[in-house]
């Protein structure tokens, strides 16, 4: 009887694990499909968007709250100030073939959302990316930009948001949605544009009238 009971327990555990695993795989597959469907854009439309980003004039970065800018003040100096938004047109593996975004945390660290969720990464895009845009928002001080970076930092550990049209959730994030959410929630600055419906594409952070470019590569 004991052997039979043990066998039933083991069988139940195995079946339960199998069901959980199957459900997880099914959900992941559906998330992948959602991402591909949402970001299946016309190549010409996509190139026009990045062409608009490349055409943006480059300005000097805003001063710190005390009126002083650390280091060089010339336009097109790679940004290391906390709260500067970074955008690249480079593909991220096969999952996000349409660019990536992050926000500067320190001179050596960014906060970003990758497939594993919100994490910190290396602030070395000037050497590791083929393309890079540094942008900052109109209407905020450098101290407020720092608050936005802190908001993003506080989301570390939250999972990746594969449901790209859902920019309103705060339980999970994709890269450009993370930056969008920080400025929307803190300062009611909407960095989304009319392009790509409700999804927030990384290039929109460059092309929106709410930001201006301080660095390009």
Annotate each predicted stretch with a short phrase.
Residues 46-66, 104:
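Short, basic/aromatic beta-hairpin or loop at an interaction surface
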Residues 60-78:
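Mixed-charge, Lys/Arg-rich low-complexity intrinsically disordered regions
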Residues 135-195:
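Active-site nucleophile-His-acid catalytic modules used for acyl/amide transfer and hydrolysis
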Residues 29, 45-55, 170-217:
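Activation targets extended, charge/polar-rich intrinsically disordered C-terminal tails
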Residues 78-139, 160-170:
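Glycine-rich catalytic cores of cysteine/serine-nucleophile enzymes that process amide/ester linkages
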Residues 20-36:
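Sec-dependent signal peptide cleavage junction
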Residues 12-21:
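Bacterial N-terminal signal peptides
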Residues 2-10:
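Bacterial N-terminal signal peptides that target proteins for export
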């Amino acid at each position: 009887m004991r052997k039979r009971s043990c066998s039933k327990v083991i069988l139940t555990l195995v079946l339960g694990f199998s069901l959980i695993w199957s459900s997880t795989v099914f959900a992941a597959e559906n998330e992948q499909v959602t991402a591909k469907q949402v970001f299946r854009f016309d190549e010409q439309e996509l190139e026009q968007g990045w062409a608009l980003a490349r055409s943006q004039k480059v300005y000097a970065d805003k001063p710190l709250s005390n009126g002083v800018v650390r280091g060089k003040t010339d336009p097109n100096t790679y940004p290391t100030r906390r709260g500067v938004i970074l955008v690249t047109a480079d593909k991220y593996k096969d999952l996000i073939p349409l660019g990536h975004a992050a926000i500067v945390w320190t001179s050596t660290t960014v906060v970003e959302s990758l497939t594993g969720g919100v994490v910190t990464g290396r602030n070395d895009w000037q050497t590791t990316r083929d393309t890079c845009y540094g942008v900052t928002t109109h209407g905020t001080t450098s101290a407020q930009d720092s608050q936005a970076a802190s908001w993003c930092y506080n989301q570390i550990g939250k999972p990746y948001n594969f449901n790209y049209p859902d920019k309103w959730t705060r339980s999970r994030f994709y890269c450009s949605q993370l930056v969008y959410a920080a400025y929307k929630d803190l300062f009611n600055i909407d960095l989304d544009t009319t392009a790509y419906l409700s999804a927030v594409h990384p290039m929109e952070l460059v092309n929106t009238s709410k930001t201006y470019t301080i660095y390009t590569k």
